[in-house]
């Protein structure tokens, strides 16, 4: 029913971790209030409704991008916009899940 809530597969994890090793920028597309309640250290907060207007700025970073949100739905929307603009982008799904994956790699 809520397929966007599924856990990232091992293949997805590998791709995302490889992108992080290449210097990927994590964009949290939740609203600023949600972002302040918890986020991945070093991530940038660009709400999903602002992604289209920030495409050129994001493109200039010249780095892979990983989008996250609360459930994975808004980050999927942002991924579609960025992908259509030719940006290398991955949907990291829920921010707290990606934070756990990153922490496990560090440990």
Predicted regions, residues:
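Rhodanese-like catalytic fold shared by cysteine-dependent sulfurtransferases
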Residues: 2-15, 22, 32-64, 73-107
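Short hydrophobic beta-strand that contains or immediately precedes a catalytic carboxylate
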Residues: 25-29
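Short, surface-exposed ligand- or partner-binding patches at beta-edge/loop junctions that are enriched
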Residues: 68
